[in-house]
Amino acid sequence: MENQVSSFLIDSPMEWKTYMKSLSDDNPSFGDVTVNLTKISVSSKNAKSYAEEMYNYVTQEMVFISERSRLLLRAKRRLYKNQSLMKKTSVSTSNTVKMVFMSLAKQIEQMLKFCMMVYSKLCEAFETTLKVAKEFQICDSSQEWFFQFQLGYHRKQMELQMLSFVAEWLVLTQHYTDALNDSAKTLYDIMESSHKAAQKV
């Protein structure tokens, strides 16, 4: 992510597009700290330094993923608004279009729920890593091997699986939700215009 997301509500298409432009689709991530972290090897020589880096890294990632989760909830709110809009349309001949939209909206909602579930699990993993990294910095030398092993395991989980997986899903879901939300109002306007034109004939 190139720019830190601000806390304002992103409801208009322009605000949403501005946010999406700040994302890196080539390498979706919640920060650039991962690149620096991978250069740190877990060994007794720099173990405490690694624990400190891991602690700082996870703290930053928690902030970024929290911002993403809020954006997903806002996207879901927009989706519900557009669902209500489509249900209220007075065009009787547009049942097929409405059915397609509602079906897509249902699929997007499932994706949003899935992303929130992954977000919850990722937070649990981050909290565990934070605890391990913090305790490692004050542990006795006889306990270092244990914390060192745990930190290495958590780093592997985050770098090879969890971070890249959830990042790609969040970006993909935001793209789908954005496209569906942007098309909903257009479909509604077209259907209403067609209905009014038919009444005049």
From Swiss-Prot:
One Gene Ontology term, aspect cellular component: nucleus
Chief location: nucleus
Membrane-spanning parts: none
Gene Ontology biological-process annotations: chromosome segregation; karyogamy involved in conjugation with cellular fusion; meiotic cell cycle
Domain of life from the UniProt record: Eukaryota
Compartments in which it is found: Nucleus
Function: Required for correct meiotic chromosome segregation and recombination.
Entry protein name: Twin horsetail protein 2
